[in-house]
Amino acid sequence: MVTPQHAQELSTGARELGIDLSEAQHEQLLAYLALLIKWNKAYNLTAVRNPDEMVSRHLLDSLSVVPFIEGTRWMDVGSGGGMPGIPMAILFPERNISLLDSNGKKTRFQTQVKLELKLDNLEVIHSRAENYQPDVPFDGIISRAFSSLEDFAGWTRHMGDVNTRWLAMKGLHPADELVALPSDFHLDSAQALTVPGCQGQRHLLILRRTA
């Protein structure tokens, strides 16, 4: 159940992140949270079981990457419960956001969210990353707790080109993973993120293809 405390935490946290949510966006994010809480009991969408932790660890964590979203077509790989792709679709109705996951339960949940929240800019794809072939390269490809940087780059290489930005949301700065980055990728920048209500470290690594 979504409480007034959750609503206040979302409003305050978004402001701390420099994001001015409209009333409609605030309501949509809370409606998404309500669906996540409801479906998580049966579908195991997230390891976070306590609804009181979901605003910071899911919604605000997803919103923390908003300043780094450029371009019109984005892919959220291994989206799971829809993070960060669904919050991105709510914040950016003018952008096309695709969610990709190989787990049928999770894509069914994502489809339900799309229908209930009327997110016409959201596409749900049930597939493994290496098997999905887009018609044109994405402007950006993002993942949150999906895999190692090596696998993230390797499994999604074909979805982008030299103009694409790969955004990997991580906890601790993964220096060991950067060493194993495929030779045709390089680190463009690394950002330390501060997420309201989250105690642990958060980092965003932005990768580019060199060829």
Curated annotation (Swiss-Prot):
Record InterPro entries: rRNA_ssu_MeTfrase_G, SAM-dependent_MTases_sf
Binding-site list for S-adenosyl-L-methionine: G78, M83, A129, E130, R144
Subcellular compartments: Cytoplasm
Enzyme class: transferase
Entry keyword Cell wall biogenesis/degradation: no
Pfam families referenced in this protein's UniProt entry, alphabetically: GidB
UniProt key word Transferase: yes
A cellular component term, taken from the record's GO annotations: cytosol
Reaction(s) the record says it catalyses: guanosine(527) in 16S rRNA + S-adenosyl-L-methionine = N(7)-methylguanosine(527) in 16S rRNA + S-adenosyl-L-homocysteine
EC nos: 2.1.1.170
Key words, A-Z: Cytoplasm, Methyltransferase, rRNA processing, S-adenosyl-L-methionine, Transferase
UniProt GO molecular function: rRNA (guanine-N7-)-methyltransferase activity
Family recorded in the similarity comment: Belongs to the methyltransferase superfamily. RNA methyltransferase RsmG family.
Summary of the function given for this chain in its UniProt record: Specifically methylates the N7 position of guanine in position 527 of 16S rRNA.
Protein name: Ribosomal RNA small subunit methyltransferase G
Species, as recorded: Pseudomonas syringae pv. tomato (strain ATCC BAA-871 / DC3000)
Name of the encoding gene: rsmG
